[in-house]
Curated annotation (Swiss-Prot):
Organism name: Citrobacter koseri (strain ATCC BAA-895 / CDC 4225-83 / SGSC4696)
Keyword Metal-binding: yes
Protein name: UPF0758 protein CKO_05095
Top-level taxonomic group: Bacteria
GO biological process: proteolysis
UniProt family annotation: Belongs to the UPF0758 family. YicR subfamily.
Segments carrying motif JAMM motif: 169-182
Residues noted as binding Zn(2+) in the record, renumbered to the chain: H169, H171, D182
GO molecular-function terms, A-Z: metal ion binding; metallopeptidase activity
Domain (MPN) ranges: 98-220
Keyword annotations from UniProtKB, A to Z: Hydrolase, Metal-binding, Metalloprotease, Protease, Zinc
UniProt xrefs under InterPro entries: MPN, RadC_JAB, UPF0758, UPF0758_CS, UPF0758_N, UPF0758_YicR
Amino acid sequence: MDAPERLMPREKMLKSGIGSLTDVELLALFLRTGVPGKDVMALAHETLQRSGSLYGLLSADFAQFRGTGIGIAKYAQLKGIAELARRYYKARMMKENALLSPEMTREFLQSQLTGEEREIFLVIFLDARHRVIKHSRLFSGTLNHVEVHPREIIREAIKLNASAVILAHNHPSGCAEPSKADKLITERVVKCCQFMDIRVLDHLVIGRGEYVSFAERGWI
């Protein structure tokens, strides 16, 4: 069932720009129509409430959509949007050959690690001017653990002639707070890199709609 025109966010977007839309309005714009007994704004609001956030929505599996009125076609489109965002940030980083700000770094890492069901440890390798040489998913693990080998990071950095690295991994559980093991492995990597005159600029832990930066907390 279509929402009345006054409820559609399309006019608001055309008048004030896409950035003026709330998360609910943006989702309603994507959904276009509601379902019997529920207009599109109500459907969008309920769907976001169930998933907790846009992050939760885009990383959810299809089982979580059952009973919402969103079918397999819309689910596939949502997953496509998430993948487009991931590839956009990757293409942007590779084109500009740089991460120009902490915010851009965070957004890129969130786009790469959001929705992963296992812990992934990713490393960004940078040259002496902090331009991106390459980023690699060096290690993958289980739901709550990933085995990290500092020597593999060093080997790749030397091969690429990197002067600095940024570390990142995700917590599929959603909580970005670093564990004791996260802190210990970061210390090990930092010490190994210092020995080879390679700087560790940061280690970001990506959770569900949140993150923790070791550099921002003064741990690096």
